[in-house]
Amino acid sequence: MNYNGIDVTKSELADNIETVPFQYDNGEHGNPNDGFVGSVSGSTSAGLGVYHGPIYKLAKQYADNVYDLTGSNFDTVVNKVEEGHPVWTITTTAFAPVSDFESWDTPDGKIDVTYSEHSVCITGFDRDKRVIYVNDPYGYKNREVDWNDFAAAYKQMGKQAVYVTKCSNRTSYA
């Protein structure tokens, strides 16, 4: 978001993301489609992550020009990056498909989740080298990852992607 002229910190976003319990009293788990599951910081309790819907909703609190690409093929995501728009995506910590999914009962029904869920911002790519560059919240800027593996993980994780275009002259946020 900072890239697009939106003055907001990661901490502020973390404080404002919708959250749901990791586990309810009845044994059901939170649904990442409804909010960040558990503790965002991980300091007070377990946390899993969040899917595109709550991220889109959060971004709309700060900018008018937010777009949800969820369901789009990976080429569409790459095209947006080529147009100059970094794209937030859901992937895995391996940046490749994983096999450690488990089924959770949630208030909305059963969903399959993985503790390998991860999100990054795609910042660039090199078609000749077949690599994608991502800003990884684990401390890596423009981290190089394999294109085909990343595209397969993107598909496995539900083709979830959100991007923001240059900030309009919006004067109030949140």
Predicted segments, located by residue:
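Short coil-to-beta transition motif at edge beta-strands of beta-rich domains
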Residues: 81, 85-87, 92-93, 103
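Noncatalytic regulatory segments and standalone regulatory/sensor domains
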Residues: 101-114, 123-174
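Cysteine-nucleophile protease catalytic domains, especially the papain-like/related folds used
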Residues: 1-77, 82-83, 167-172
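Short, flexible/disordered intra-domain loops and linkers
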Residues: 41-45, 97-108
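Structured helix-beta-strand junction loops
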Residues: 62, 83-84, 128, 157
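Structural recognition of the beta-strand scaffold that forms the well-ordered cores
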Residues: 67-68, 86-91, 121, 132-135, ...
